[in-house]
């Protein structure tokens, strides 16, 4: 009997020495809008090796862990401009993503290229409200994914943004969009009542808030939902601080639903600790900074592989071409003014059209900050990475006014110094002038812009009804690069004022 007691004690001690598997908890790791930020940003945050160190530590703490990417893994640095997704999609498997959804920028090189990359990605690819049946992406996606943890089942489904007005039509041809609000709660209900899952989690790329007021967002969907238990948000680049008040939204039944998002560029990693018994969810952020460098340095094979691509990026990134008098954040009025005024000068020269009235650009097309001091070729390439062309439109005054109404409704866009507008607290256009004169609906105006807007991007439908007088053959970023080189050769620096050209009264 004593011998049996000793054996039982030894077994008990052995069991106590083994860390308990948290079968009652699921750890969900999520990132969004990492935008090809392979290495740390200029402020020292982010980087894929650091993120991998975070992922691996969390997985070691709880084997019941899933890793999610909520879209826009690509576009925004030279890694994508030069290598067209080769780096980012290969890293999906290296970092061990379990499930991914599409952002709008995944379409930037068209669906043929995207399909070629996605065939080699092991992660489950989820899309609930896109019908790919008539596209090259057919067969690569599933509407939801269920993760079993013990006797509990957790479902993830993906809600994608309306491509109209946001994705170039040629890049999403034959893609059928299903209305996000209708699909979201219906899917969650189906998962619970038919598939009998315990939790339904929406992974979304429509935004915490709407860029275009007529489009839905995550808060609207939660507000009309009865069945969604949690939302992993993206697209709007919102940093939803844990415990800051934005991370819980009341649903249709008055229940507070957790929602999280990490800004952009992979500077933060979100964690959601789901108690599978109680349903409680604890949302948190981990900062991706230098404290992870030691752990990140251990990924020798990955870092060596990345160095093969870094050489090409660095050769461009380190080539100085101009200088700037000041720092300008990519969302600032100053950089929007500089880009729009530069556009006026450039298009007037390359088109030969001398009577251009104003320039209209999209503020979302300026992807990085302008530093004070040295400006490199790589920085200009990263700032303007898109494959868009300058165009000149002949716009009736009525269409220009309609365009300005849209711009005012979202807080303004980038316009040249000739154009000024004001709007009220409701976002309604009050007054618009060109060179100090009120815009006449009966007059025709010559407007410089880019083909993305002229094709209806950023919901600029009025521009699609206008006659094109000129379409350039080069990427507009190439023209801006040559423009800043000319400034430098003339002894001039990049500079702009903080003037608000479309402002609220």
Regions found by a protein language model. Give the residues of each.
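Bacterial N-terminal signal peptides
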Residues: 9-17
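Feature captures C-terminal
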Residues: 25-27, 37-46, 50, 122-129, ...
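Short, solvent-exposed aromatic-acidic interface loops
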Residues: 283-296, 435-437
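Acidic, metal/ion-coordinating pockets
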Residues: 22-289, 339-345, 356-359, 390, ...
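Bacterial N-terminal signal peptides that target proteins for export
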Residues: 1-8
